[in-house]
């Protein structure tokens, strides 16, 4: 594991975060990494966050004091978003090293280093059993709500469900389906929005290609800022990647979030569903049927304003994806069951 694994840490912190807190989070993130990775296989990508450069270099120097050498610190002058930072780090490792496996871990310490051996073990087993390297493993959270809050947990569950339905429909047209055999030991849809994933070189290259292609196709959409998990997962599934899942630890409450437009869920989540439906050329009757069925099941519909918000996003989907077609009436909640 130590000789064959590379790791990227995208580094961005809010402008008002004290430098001491940044150093603390980075020190925690890098803690004990030398047990599982060689220093030269660790890349910190400071993503257009000048106030984080000194803390990143300080954490790298602390790491070298105990491990013998520093991880690489790459400073990007402009902010490309988490997707851009991870792509930059993966591209470096793919170009400059011979590591067989790659992962990314958040800079807030949420992705516990001691979960990494479990992800690695499953990935290697899958590679051996399947006889190819088109495999990836995700670290599944036991609860989506406690680390992120109720709203984000509900919308991530929606993303996971509709992603599987849409991708399954698209793949079925060519006689295929998503291969989730290694995910089904855990309950529910796989936690595709989890940022703690492990890739082979082949699937890491596909990850980078998916995000770079999506960004270049629609530069005005800034896919690298919001699509790191969603867009890459869709493209990997479509390409026939075999996913596996293992449970991982997570914070009870995240110390920071870089989630864009978290206070505007129509934009934060609506554009992801729009991208999915456009990418797969989903017809309106199917796309809205999936949406209607999914929102009837989520508990977000029961909070004040939640149902209206879900219908607002439904209208947004219809306008953006099928502007020339009148949408059918939305479902009704007030039925006995």
Residue ranges of predicted features:
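Terminal low-complexity segments of carbohydrate-biosynthetic enzymes
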Residues: 3, 262-337
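Short beta-strand/loop segment that forms part of the nucleotide-sugar
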Residues: 38-50, 74-78
């Amino acid at each position: 594991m130590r000789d064959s694994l590379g790791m990227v840490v995208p580094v961005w912190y809010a402008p008002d975060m004290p430098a001491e807190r940044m150093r603390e989070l980075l020190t925690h993130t890098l803690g004990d990494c030398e047990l599982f990775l060689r220093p030269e296989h660790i890349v910190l990508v400071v993503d257009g966050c000048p106030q984080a450069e000194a803390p990143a270099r300080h954490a790298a120097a602390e790491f070298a004091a105990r491990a013998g050498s520093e991880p690489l610190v790459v400073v990007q002058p402009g902010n490309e978003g988490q997707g851009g930072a991870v792509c930059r780090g993966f591209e470096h490792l793919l170009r400059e090293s011979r590591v067989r496996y790659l992962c990314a871990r958040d800079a807030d310490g949420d992705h516990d280093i001691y979960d990494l051996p479990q992800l690695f073990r499953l990935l290697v087993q899958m590679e051996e059993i399947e006889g190819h390297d088109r495999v990836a493993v995700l670290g599944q959270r036991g609860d989506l709500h406690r680390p992120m809050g109720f709203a984000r947990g509900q919308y991530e569950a929606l993303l996971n469900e509709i992603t599987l339905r849409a991708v399954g429909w698209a793949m079925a047209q060519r006689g295929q389906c998503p291969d989730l055999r290694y995910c089904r030991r855990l309950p529910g849809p796989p936690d595709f929005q989890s940022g703690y994933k492990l890739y082979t070189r082949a699937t890491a290259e596909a990850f980078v290609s998916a995000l770079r292609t999506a960004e270049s196709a629609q530069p005005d959409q800034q896919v690298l800022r919001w699509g790191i998990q969603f867009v890459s997962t869709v493209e990997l599934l479509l390409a026939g990647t075999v996913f596996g899942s293992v449970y991982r630890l997570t914070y009870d409450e995240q110390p920071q979030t870089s989630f864009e437009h978290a206070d505007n869920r129509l934009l934060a989540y609506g554009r992801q569903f729009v991208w999915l439906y456009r990418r797969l050329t989903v017809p309106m009757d199917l796309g809205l049927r999936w949406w209607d069925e999914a929102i009837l099941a989520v508990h977000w519909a029961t909070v004040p304003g939640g149902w209206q918000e879900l219908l607002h996003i439904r209208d947004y989907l219809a306008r953006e994806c099928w502007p020339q077609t009148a949408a059918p009436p939305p479902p009704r909640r007030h039925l006995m069951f």
